[in-house]
Amino acid sequence: MFLKKEKFNWQTESLTIFELSALQRIEYITFMTTEEKTVSADSDGISDQEMTARLIGSNIRCGARLIAMSLWHNDPAGTDVETLYQQVLSGWPPEAIGKAEMQIKLLSGMLVPVDDDNAADPDASAEAKSAEPVSAEKPLPAS
């Protein structure tokens, strides 16, 4: 198989996650589109609390779907994505769903890794140290 994989750890549990295939990415985008339509349906007359609840639920469902699609690669002949999705929703805490979602998106190239303080580019930090300080004040005329 050509798909990248890595270990996902949550507390004392560990499992293998996979990047999404091209077809799964298309299916995931379609799922997200349906979720967005559900969240925005009849949104004009609802309270802020109702909208917040809809958005949180949608975020959790989208994360659980992504995880289910990834986990499916552990045994393609076994449990289907829909069953895995329901298992993730009913058995995983929201924090674990969020962490796994981010890890799968990074693995799948759906998010760009963030460099910590330009650690990968030592020239950038050297330039920042030698640069003149930035100020909102107008420069004084030379005398």
Regions found by a protein language model. Give the residues of each.
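Short, isolated positions in well-ordered beta-strands
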Residues: 13-17
